[in-house]
């Protein structure tokens, strides 16, 4: 029997997502070094974050499949897909990893002051709040709404996670050129820059596992992504400690892949595009 072709088109999706995001973020990078107002820069960052979600909506419109659109809306708003047994992992993994990494950093000169919660003015600015709360929502609406499924419909989850992780890391590139942005500060060290890209690839494995173990719930992925962003924002972990966090993330991801190898290495992907 001839295999039914997948309705998902990964290449156009990622091209649109990158084009939208990079246009606004590279414009932001220009204005950040040429006297652009903070309000304008915040708007450009927000518009860039919309890239994945905009790409997903465009692809659903081009596909014109009521089934895919209905499936997307359901996964975007319904809580019934979430497996409650995964909630502790979703909500507490990153606070636990960061605190463990801080403890491990102390013998190597890390500051005990990393064990703190910050809610200072720098955290409460509009650009910061946009990044912390809106970024996970808009990203996951696109990445897990269409992007990851589009790759998974053709390949194993392991290959999907590697390839998507690399694309996701590369997608952030313009942020490194925005003066005053967190990513721009990482350019002072090749290790810290490399750690960001490595952590993003590993993060793809963790979020994708939650995604498919929660019946492709976008809300579950948003909560895990939000937990990571909030934890990294309010716990003042030093850059060396963040490297330790990445190592711990890798160990958790490796344990998940080994323990759930059928999910990661089976070619079939039930429910996608059906």
Segments (PLM) and residue ranges:
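Membrane-interface helix/loop boundary segments of multi-pass membrane proteins
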Residues: 138-165, 212-217
């Amino acid at each position: 029997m001839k295999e039914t072709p997948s309705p998902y088109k990964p290449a156009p999706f990622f091209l649109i997502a990158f084009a939208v995001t990079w246009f606004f973020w590279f414009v932001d990078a220009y204005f950040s070094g040429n006297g652009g107002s903070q309000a304008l820069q915040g708007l450009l960052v927000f518009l860039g974050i919309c890239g994945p979600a905009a790409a997903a909506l465009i692809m659903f419109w081009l596909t014109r499949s009521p089934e895919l659109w209905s499936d997307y809306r359901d996964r975007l708003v319904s809580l019934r897909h979430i497996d409650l047994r995964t909630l502790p992992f979703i909500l507490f993994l990153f606070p636990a990893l960061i605190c463990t990494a801080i403890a491990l950093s102390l013998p190597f000169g890390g500051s005990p002051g990393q064990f703190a919660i910050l809610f200072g003015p720098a955290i409460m600015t509009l650009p910061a709040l946009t990044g912390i709360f809106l970024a996970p929502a808009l990203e996951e609406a696109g990445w897990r709404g269409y992007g990851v499924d589009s790759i998974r419909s053709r390949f194993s989850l392991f290959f999907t996670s590697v390839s998507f992780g690399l694309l996701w890391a590369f997608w952030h590139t313009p942020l490194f050129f925005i003066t005053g942005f967190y990513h721009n500060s990482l350019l002072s060290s090749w290790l810290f820059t490399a750690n960001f890209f490595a952590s993003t690839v590993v993060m793809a494995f963790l979020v994708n596992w939650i995604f498919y173990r929660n019946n492709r719930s976008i809300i579950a992925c948003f909560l895990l992504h939000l937990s990571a962003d909030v934890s990294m924002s309010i716990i003042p972990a030093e850059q060396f400690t963040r490297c330790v966090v990445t190592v711990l993330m890798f160990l958790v991801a490796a344990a998940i892949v080994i323990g759930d190898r059928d999910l990661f290495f089976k070619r079939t992907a039930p429910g996608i595009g059906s």
